[in-house]
């Protein structure tokens, strides 16, 4: 299975890129599945902390705290949990909210996987408190993605980038910049 891990600051366009990438890969007759690592975290935040809005400073802090706690118990907690949802016939798994090296290690540790790491950058991404931004920046600085995408253009530009990325994933080409 090919695994595309997409990271970037909040509001950088990760989900949009994932959706566009899935469309282009689907056009190549590949079975694509998008799975967010944060889905179980959002569920826990809602059930245990009554968090409905994850895009606030408080929501972000709670979600980061839950993630840190669960990863301290099991380094691959969310990866194992989420893989139960991925259909067996999946050719390409897209995770558009990659934040931790654990995720990369989990998928790279399985011989049958080919892992592609992507960072989406955007100048005017969503603005959070200094504390939340610093934690996000610290997490992202450790990831060392293979591909870096600048998303300061139009949606048409991002579509072209997604198409190029789909070709890269489908053809197993080697590149550093899309």
Question: Could you describe each region identified by the protein language model?
Answer:
Residues 9:
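P-loop (Walker A) phosphate-binding loop of NTP-binding proteins
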Residues 1-4, 115:
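Extreme N-terminal starter segment of soluble prokaryotic enzymes
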Residues 14:
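Conserved lysine of the Walker
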Residues 6, 95:
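Hydrophobic anchor at the beta1->P-loop junction of P-loop NTPases
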Residues 82, 116, 120-178:
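Small-molecule kinase domains that catalyze NTP-dependent phosphoryl transfer to phosphate-bearing small molecules
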């Amino acid at each position: 299975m090919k695994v595309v891990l997409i990271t970037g600051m909040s509001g950088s366009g990760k989900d949009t890129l994932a959706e566009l990438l899935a469309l282009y890969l689907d056009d190549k007759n590949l079975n694509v599945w998008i799975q967010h690592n944060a889905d179980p975290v959002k569920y826990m935040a809602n059930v245990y902390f009554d968090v409905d809005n994850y895009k606030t400073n408080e929501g972000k802090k709670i979600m980061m705290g839950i993630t840190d706690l669960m990863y301290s118990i099991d380094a691959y907690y969310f990866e194992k949990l989420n893989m139960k949802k991925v259909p067996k016939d999946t050719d390409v798994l897209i995770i558009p909210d990659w934040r931790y090296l654990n995720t990369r290690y989990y998928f790279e540790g399985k011989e049958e996987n080919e892992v592609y790491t992507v960072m989406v950058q955007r100048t005017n991404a969503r603005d959070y408190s200094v504390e939340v931004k610093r934690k996000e920046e610290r997490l992202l600085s450790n990831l060392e993605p293979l591909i870096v995408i600048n998303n300061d253009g139009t949606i048409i530009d991002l579509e072209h980038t997604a198409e190029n990325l789909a070709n890269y994933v489908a053809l197993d080409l080697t590149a550093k910049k899309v």
